[in-house]
Amino acid sequence: MFDNALLSLSHEQQQQAVEKIQVLMQRGMSSGEAIALVAKELREAHDNEKINSEKTKSAEK
């Protein structure tokens, strides 16, 4: 699922994302591709975290 919502990232998470983008670019990926890939990974991680949180809440009922 593609979600255009802005994610709220801590400073540390932002730094990690920047570093990953830089590594991908050093390996030859364009900046646009690197940013898109890291953003996709962040969205997927956020979605998985949200799903796990909802499962936990359901189990507590």
From Swiss-Prot:
InterPro entries from the xrefs?
UPF0181 (IPR005371)
Origin: domain of life:
Bacteria
Output the NCBIfam families linked to this UniProt entry. PRK05114.1
Q: Which family does it belong to?
A: Belongs to the UPF0181 family.
Q: What name does this protein carry?
A: UPF0181 protein MS1074
State the organism named in the record.
Mannheimia succiniciproducens (strain KCTC 0769BP / MBEL55E)
